[in-house]
Design a protein with these regions (language model features):
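Gly/Pro/Ser/Thr-rich low-complexity, intrinsically disordered segments predominantly at protein N-termini
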Residues: 1-174
Length: 174
């Protein structure tokens, strides 16, 4: 399937599909805690993003990681005026909420694809079964990684703010 066919079909589809080198891959539904964690990030960051002229997406807008790859992150921010109406090409911040069905891809192929995006400053993986977050930070031309468990915080440079694990996991029951 061509990129053009994929984008056209995805525009009218009730099911989300990621696109990897000519193949459309259906996205599975997730548990309520997964959705709650993604929505929590929206509540924390959307107003600030709006004030800074940035845009927040949650689960329903694609990120183009290569010419032939489109992924659906759980949460992303872009401050680029040049993004296409159908997808982000220049996100500065991406979050994936981990689940049994996505963890391997989130730590594997998506990690590789996302960290190749020149605009990306942070890639954050949020556990949905415990208070645990992995933060990948762009430091010049290299990436560093930090694991946060129970407490801690990470910065979101493009929004000039920090997020704590307490904010993300407030009232979340495992």
């Amino acid at each position: 399937m061509s990129v053009e066919d994929y984008l056209e079909r995805e525009r009218v589809s009730d099911v989300r599909h990621e696109y990897v080198d000519g193949v459309a891959l259906a996205m599975a539904g997730e548990k309520r805690v997964h959705n709650r964690l993604a929505r929590r990030l929206v509540l924390l960051l959307e107003r600030l993003a709006d004030q800074l002229g940035c845009e927040v997406i949650v689960e329903t807008v694609k990120v183009r990681t290569r010419d032939t790859r489109y992924r659906y992150p759980d949460f992303a921010v872009s401050c680029s005026a040049g993004d296409d109406p159908l997808y982000f090409a220049n996100p500065c911040f991406i979050v994936e909420v981990l689940s049994d069905s996505t963890e391997h891809t989130d730590f594997g192929k998506k990690l590789d694809e996302y960290t190749r995006l020149p605009s990306l400053q942070r890639y954050v993986l949020v556990a949905s079964d415990s208070r645990f977050v992995v933060v990948y930070r762009r430091e010049g031309t290299r990436w560093t990684v930090e694991s946060l468990e129970e407490t801690g915080e990470f910065d979101v440079p493009c929004l000039e703010t920090t997020v704590t694990l307490e904010q993300i996991y407030a009232d979340v029951q495992f």
